[in-house]
Regions:
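A generic structural signal for short beta-strands and their flanking turns/coil linkers
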Residues: 31, 91-93, 223, 241, ...
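Low-complexity, Lys/Gly-biased intrinsically disordered segments
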Residues: 2-42, 60, 195-237, 252-254
Length: 374
């Protein structure tokens, strides 16, 4: 019989904090690592972008977490997990989980267990206004408790799988670099336009540039996918993790918020510039933080435009033109004004054919990674 225990019973759980930014003495020449979500990039966390002083630690809700503490993101980006290899503090978007008795639960087992439940936690978080879970909710989360020998066997197996995934992920990254290199070879870099292409704006090759619904319908367990900027950050549309709305609510929405095949979706709020191609005829809707680019395919190849928009110069252009303080937003008028090469459609198609061939290799590698995860 499987035994489950609540996280609050097997771990000491605390949230982080942020010293006042207005007090330089809390930050200048600090030597205490201060972890943010973007610092959780892999299994082990060994460094941070920012540091705070001992005065900043003592005059804020930040807490010093010891090496071996499991970090878990509880705000905005939910369910990211890492293990501290150093003593550090964290901000309030991160919870620190310190195992009370490591003879019963290994931190590394806890890491893998929590990582496997990310989709469940994301669904739980979407039930609240700001996509977050609080410490009370986290403490109630149940974990399967097995004996230490089995925990070690699971850790050993998953470490091996992790190594394979890292290697295959590197291969994927190399394929991405190959595609970028081919783009520059055929069209040049948008930063310099060394081929002297005439320039257009994005609106010149678009039939519609708009965004999705502004009032969120009620979520349901099964229904029509509702895609936001959050589901675009990997470069493709993550339908499987998107919240769902009812078919009746979907039908009541304006058609502008219902993308069509060969449209490009573009994150316009928060993490600006993530984009993905709609390569299916399935029905779904988008939120207001995702822009829909409906294209005139007689003027532009969607695959070519997708990679053009991902070029560093265009990404930087979009970030420079974004408005707002706490949360940046790229307004529709600025999206329409994105500068665009006017290059032959035949050459764009040639590039798209190259991408199609590379995608065959991508598919094989991703399938191998998926098998490893399963």
């Amino acid at each position: 019989m499987m035994e489950y225990k609540k996280l609050g019973n097997i771990c000491n759980i605390v949230s982080g904090g942020t010293p006042s930014r207005s007090k330089s003495q809390y930050w200048d020449n600090g030597n205490i690592p201060w972890i943010k979500i973007r610092d959780i990039k892999s299994k082990y966390i060994e460094d941070s972008e920012e540091f705070i002083t001992i005065e900043g630690l003592n005059n804020s809700s930040a807490k010093l977490l010891t090496k071996g503490t499991v970090l878990y993101t509880i705000f905005a980006t939910l369910g990211e997990v890492g293990i501290l290899k150093i003593d550090a503090c964290a901000n309030q978007a991160i919870a620190g989980l310190t195992v009370k008795d490591e003879t019963k639960i290994l931190p590394e087992y806890l890491y893998y267990y929590l990582k496997s439940k990310k989709n469940i936690v994301n669904k739980l978080g979407r039930g609240v206004a700001q996509n977050n879970i609080n410490l009370s909710m986290l403490k109630e989360f149940e974990i399967e408790v097995i004996d230490i020998v089995k925990q070690n066997n699971i850790i050993k197996t998953l470490n091996y799988v992790d190594d394979i995934i890292k290697f295959k992920s590197l291969e994927l990254k190399q394929l991405d670099e190959l595609v970028k290199a081919r783009f520059v070879e055929l069209f040049g870099d948008p930063a310099t336009n060394e081929y002297n292409w005439p320039m257009l704006n994005l609106e010149n090759v678009s039939s519609i540039i708009t965004y999705g619904l502004t009032v969120r319908p009620t979520y349901v367990n099964k229904g029509i996918d509702l895609i936001s900027a959050r589901e675009l950050h990997k470069g493709f549309i993550e339908y499987e993790v998107a919240p769902k709305i009812s078919f009746n609510d979907f039908q009541s929405l304006s058609d502008k918020g219902k993308p069509l095949k060969n449209d490009i979706l573009f994150s316009k709020t928060g993490s600006i510039g993530h984009c993905a191609l709609v390569d299916t005829d399935k029905m779904f809707a988008i939120t207001q933080n995702a822009a829909r680019l409906g294209l005139i395919i007689e003027k532009v190849n969607p695959v070519w435009l997708l990679y053009y928009l991902r070029m560093n110069y265009i990404q930087d252009w979009c970030k420079r033109h974004a408005k707002g303080n706490a949360v940046k937003d790229l307004q529709l008028k600025d999206i329409k004004a994105i500068p665009l090469f006017e290059c032959p459609l035949e050459l764009q198609n040639q590039f798209a054919d190259f991408v199609k061939e590379v995608d065959k290799s991508r598919f094989i590698i991703k399938s191998m990674i998926k098998e490893g995860l399963l």
